[in-house]
Amino acid sequence: MRRIVVLALLLAGCAGSDDPQPPTPLQRELSELAETMELTHPELFHDVPRATFRAEGAKLANAAPELTRDELVVGVMRLAALPGARDGHTAVYPFDQHARGLHVYPLRLYDFADGLHVVGSLGAEGLTGRRVTAIGDRTIAEVVELVRPLVPHDNESGFRWLLPEYLTTAEVLRGLGIVAGDTATYSFADGTDAVLEPVDAGEVASTLGGAPAPLPTEHDPVWLRELATDQWLTTLEGGKVVYFGYRLTTGPTHDTAERLLALARKPGVRRVVFDVRLNHGGDNTTYGPLLDVLARPVVERKLVVLTGRSTFSAAGNFVAEVDRATSARFLGEPAGGAPSQWGDSIAIMLERAGLTVHVATAYWEFGPPGDKRQETPVDVRVEPTAADFFAGRDPVLARALALP
C-alpha cells in the first residue's frame, strides 16, 4: 500500500540579516525530503551511517541551484537509494508518475545469463535480440556500475530486475555523463550501433512495459500464459503435474487453495509446481489459505516453487513463509524480495524538483527473528539465456519437471 505526501514549503519566513543568500525553494524542498525520509522510514540507517546520509542530503541541497535537470534527477535518485539492501521500496522509479515526466530511449532490455539484450523496442524492431555491449563510449559493464548507486533493491536479483529501466532513462545517462545531448548510441555484440532519441517514459511503459510487466514474446511458454489471471491453476502432462501461476498477492485465495488441494489429491499426480516468478507483490495478509494447503503432506512432498528476480514485496514475504513452513524445493533465481524487508511506501511529491520519491514506512519480518538475509536461497539455480527466451524455452519449468 502506498500513500502520497506533498512537501509544502513554508516560504513566509525571512532569512536573517546576516544571511545574504537564503535557501531557494528547491533547496528547502530537498532539505525537507531528507528530513522526511528520516522521520518516515522506521530504520533508515540500517545500511548507511546517519552521518553519511545527512552529508549527502546537505550536499545535494547545497548544489541544487547549479545542477542541470539531469544532474538533479540523478542526485535525488542517489539519495533515495542510499538506505541500501532490503529497501527496494525506497526509491525514485523512472516509469513512475512524476510532476515532470522522465524520458527513456525506446528499448526494453533484460539481463539474461549471457548479458543484457533488447527484448522489445519502439520504432526499431530490428534491434530485438541483440546483446548490448556499450552505451556511448562506455562499456555496458562500466555503465552498470555507474548506474548501480541509483537502483533500489532488496538484493542482487532485485537490482537486475529494475536495472534496465535506469539503463534506458535519458536523464540518468546524461546526468551521469554517459551520454551528451539528446541522442544516445547503443552498441551491440554484432558490431552494429543504434542512435536513439528519447521519448516520454509513459509511452514506453504503456507499450513495451516497465520491469514489472511480463516480457514481450511471440511464443507461448506456460509461465507467460493467462497473464490476466492473477491466480491461474491448471494441469500439465495429462494431469500428472499441477501448475499454479501466482501472479499477484491480491484478492481472496481460499477457493483457489481448495481447488489446488483437490487436484493434488488425485491419483497419479507426481508434482505440484508453484510459480511466483511474475509476482511483484500486493497484500501479504491474503495468502494464508494457500500457505496452509502447501504445508499439507499430500502437497508438500510434491512441491516445487519457482522464483525469480521480479518475485518482490509481499511475494518475497510469501516465499520466505513457504521456505519456513514446508520442505519445498526452490528453483530459478533467488526472489528479488528479501525474506524480511522494509515496505508499505508512501509517495512524496517534490513539486519543484518535479519528482516522486517513495519511502518505506514499515518493516516486515518474515524470516527468523533478526534475519538479515537479503534473499531466500534456491536449491537449484536456473537462469534463462537469451537463446532460451527467444526460442520460447523455459529452462526453469523444464528443470522442475525433470526433478526426481
Question: Where do the model's predicted regions map?
Answer:
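Flexible, low-complexity junctional segments that flank or bridge functional domains
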Residues: D18-R271, L278, R296, K302
